[in-house]
């Protein structure tokens, strides 16, 4: 009887550990500290609350989602563990903010992209480096990497100190049109559809603005999804970086005639 009780207690402990482990992330793991040197963290200035992720694309510019915009934003570069006191040299402010079509009138299928010019350039280091813009459009079927400090539980919100990373699949745009009829997505759009149709892996609240990296290239910006996160047959939507390349590159080059593209 004693042996049976011991075995029963061990089984209970194993089941308890398995349940806790499955709740640690929405299908991902903690990112390696050397894996995300281009990932930036956006905070609301007055409340000091974490808002979104973003991507450093050169020493002076960051790409994120338009819906992450606030009147007063702090941007931190070279961050891994958010519980560690930030160095003042990691902190930047927006000098200029640009929105596609010059207006913050994004939708679930268009214009959810914001280009931020930092108040001063960053110095590259082991943990601070840019992610290159794509040289070609992404290929459906690609395995893509997502990362961020977004919630690791859904629908409850639990924000981790260290960013989490996961692999998802780039899907045909029609998959998202079928999966999200409530969004009334148009036949064509400047967005990407990505996720795991079996469920269990997904970006979620406050991962917004972070990168979707396919075959080593910065192809998407975390934009919209359904809640709770990581449901089967509910992939998420990502702003397509490649379709905004001309706009991005011309603004960075200082052209004033392309700030409001049609």
Curated annotation (Swiss-Prot):
One GO term (biological process): proteolysis
Entry GO terms, CC: extracellular region; secretory granule
Residues making up the signal peptide according to the UniProt record: 1-18
Origin superkingdom: Eukaryota
Keywords: Blood coagulation cascade activating toxin, Disulfide bond, Glycoprotein, Hemostasis impairing toxin, Hydrolase, Ion channel impairing toxin, Potassium channel impairing toxin, Protease, Secreted, Serine protease, Signal, Toxin, Voltage-gated potassium channel impairing toxin
UniProt domain Peptidase S1: residue ranges: 25-253
Name of one Pfam family that matches: Trypsin
Glycosylation sites (chain numbering): 105
Subunit details: Monomer.
Note: Negative results: does not have phospholipase activity, does not aggregate platelet, and does not affect the release of the neurotransmitters dopamine and acetylcholine in the nervous system.
This protein's name: Thrombin-like enzyme gyroxin B1.3
Species this protein is from: Crotalus durissus terrificus (South American rattlesnake)
């Amino acid at each position: 009887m004693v042996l049976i009780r011991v075995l029963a207690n061990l089984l209970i402990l194993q089941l308890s550990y398995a349940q806790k482990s499955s709740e640690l992330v929405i299908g991902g793991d903690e990112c390696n500290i050397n894996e995300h040197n281009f990932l930036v963290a956006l905070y609301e200035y007055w409340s000091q609350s974490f808002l979104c992720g973003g991507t450093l694309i050169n020493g002076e510019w960051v790409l994120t989602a338009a819906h992450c915009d606030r009147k007063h934003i702090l941007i931190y570069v070279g961050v891994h563990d958010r519980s560690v006191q930030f160095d003042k040299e990691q902190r930047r402010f927006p000098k200029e903010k640009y929105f596609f079509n010059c207006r913050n009138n994004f939708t679930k299928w268009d214009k959810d992209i914001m280009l931020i010019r930092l108040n001063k350039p960053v110095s590259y280091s082991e943990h601070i480096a840019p992610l290159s813009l794509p040289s070609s459009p992404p290929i459906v079927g690609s395995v893509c990497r997502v990362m961020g400090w977004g919630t690791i539980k859904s629908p409850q919100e639990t924000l981790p100190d260290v960013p989490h990373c996961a692999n998802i699949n780039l899907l045909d745009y029609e998959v998202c049109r079928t999966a999200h009829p409530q969004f009334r997505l148009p036949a064509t759009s400047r967005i990407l559809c990505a996720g795991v149709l079996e469920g269990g892996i997904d970006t979620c609240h406050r991962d917004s603005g972070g990168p979707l990296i396919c075959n080593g290239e910065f192809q998407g910006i975390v934009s919209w999804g359904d809640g709770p996160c990581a449901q089967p047959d509910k992939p998420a939507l990502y702003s397509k970086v490649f379709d905004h390349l001309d706009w991005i590159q011309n603004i960075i080059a200082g052209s004033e005639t392309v700030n409001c593209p049609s």
